[in-house]
Every structure is written in structure tokens, then in C-alpha cells.
Amino acid sequence: MDNLTKVREHLKSYSRLDQAVGEIDEIEAQREEKSNYELFQEDGSEEHTKPSYFQAADDSDTESEPEIEDNQGLFVPDLEAEPVEGFIQEPLDDYADEEVDIVFTSDWKQPELESNEHGKILRLALPEGLSGEQKSQWLLTIKAVVQSAKYWNLAECTFEASGEGVIMKERQMTPDVYKVTPVMNTHPSQSEAVLDIWSLSKTSMTFQPKKASLQPLTISLEELFSSRGEFISVGGNGRMSHKDAILLGLRYKKLYNQARVKYFL
């Protein structure tokens, strides 16, 4: 105890105590942690083999892994084992595959024209197997055909199918021939002498205005219809009078109400 007391008293009077303590802390911080086994090796103890607890761990790791790899995919059926009751071994397929022609058929539904209290209905079935874009193109084509009926008579058109599609042409109509019964001592009027009113398509007709400030209305069938087919498609016929044909054209062009207010029709 006396020696320990003397050491403590000496350290208290030691002027470089703080520096020595700092150097000791720095050395301890740089010192790597080592296992007892490694410390024994540094001390010069000759250890040719690792301790038993290290060997046991290494042996278990090296033996378990190859065993798992060797057992994968090496199932060998036991030929001498008893067969399972109810199991029938089927013969293996040993024939060669042959090419077989496959034909995809579809039931085409024909267009149907129906009549009911609301009028006539035409039903067109959509072709099978169309993609979304093809379906849209098909619908637009049908719509275009329907809208074209405003400008010509579809029933009078010719239909031609080609490799690229369909061609519809306006049929050139021949003038309608009607029998005229002559009347004695009378002179036929211009409308009676004309076999087809469309022959007067370039002849203008004048309607007088109801007000003096307006100019007379002069118009012809050629200005109201682009062709005889268009004239026929909206209800015209060759036996109409010239005036009736002009009035039909005004109604077709939606000008009749305006003309009726301003002119004597």
C-alpha cells in the first residue's frame, strides 16, 4: 500500500502527466481488436492446427453444400418397387407430326330489310374478324355510300367490283318516251311537245318580284341541279312541267321560302 501511495503522490507532481495519458489513449485507439487465437500466434506460440470448435464449423459448411447440389435432379425411379394400384402405363407417342390444313370459317349474315310501324329498317351485319381500325373504316365506307344518295339515285348506279375495291358509276338515262294523243284543231303547248323536261335544263324561267325595288328572279334547272340523275334522285321526272321542276329545285336548294316571300311563284 505504501508503494501504491508513493506512486500516486509521484504522479500528482509529474508535470507531463496529461501528455502521457493522451499518448496512451492514441495507442489504444490504433490498436486492432484481435481474437485470443491471434494473440497466441503473435506471442510465438506454435499452433499448427485450429481449435476444435473452428474445425467443427468449417467441416459442417463444406460437407452440406455439395450434398445439396449432388441431390438435385438425380431422382432415379425404383424399377423393383411395387406398382401403384389403378395406374396404367400408356405407350409413348412415336409418330411423326403431319401438316394439317386448318380453315377458319365464319357465318356471313346477309343484309335484312325490315318494315314496321316506324318505317323501313336496313340491318347490315359487321364482318367478323375485323380489327378496331378496320371496323372504323368499314363504318365510314357505309356512311359515305348513304350520304352520296343526296346527290344521285343509288338505284340507277352501276356497280363494279375490282381488286382495289368497288366502283359505282352514274347510269346515263335515256329520255322517257311517252305516247302523246294528238287533239284535232289544237296546237300543243311547249310542255306537251317536250318529251323530257331535262332537255330544257339550260332554259331560264323568270319570276316577277312583289316589290318594285327587287329585280326579277331568273333561274334554270342547270343552276339548281348538277345532272339529270340528281334531278331524278330528289323526286323529279321527265313529265313535270318546267315551272314545277324549277320549284322542285328551289325546295331542294332550300330557297323556296325566301323566293315565295319576294316573288310571285
UniProtKB/Swiss-Prot annotation:
Region annotated Interaction with the L polymerase, chain positions: 49-105
Region feature (Hinge): 171-193
Region Oligomerization, annotated ranges: 109-170
InterPro entries: P-protein-C_vesiculovirus (IPR048220), Phosphoprotein_C_viral (IPR043036), Phosphoprotein_central (IPR037263)
Modification type Phosphothreonine: residues: T62
The keyword Ribosomal protein is annotated on this UniProt entry: no
Domain remark in the UniProt entry: The N-terminus is disordered and is involved in binding N(0). The region of interaction with the L polymerase is necessary for transcription. The hinge region is highly variable. The central domain is involved in oligomerization. The C-terminus is basic and essential for binding the N-RNA template.
One term under GO cellular component: virion component
Assembly with partners or alone: Homodimer. Interacts with the L polymerase; the association of P and L forms the polymerase complex and positions P optimally for encapsidation of newly synthesized genomes with the nucleoprotein. Interacts (via N-terminus) with N(0). Interacts (via C-terminus) with N in ribonucleocapsid (via C-terminus); this interaction allows to package the L polymerase in the virion and positions the polymerase on the template, since P acts as a bridge between N and L.
Principal cellular location given in the protein's record: virion
The protein's name in its UniProt record: Phosphoprotein
Annotated region described as Interaction with the Nucleoprotein-RNA and template-binding, given as residue ranges: 245-265
GO MF annotations in UniProt: RNA-directed RNA polymerase activity
Biased amino acid composition, Acidic residues: 58-69
Site feature (Involved in oligomerization) residues: W138, T141
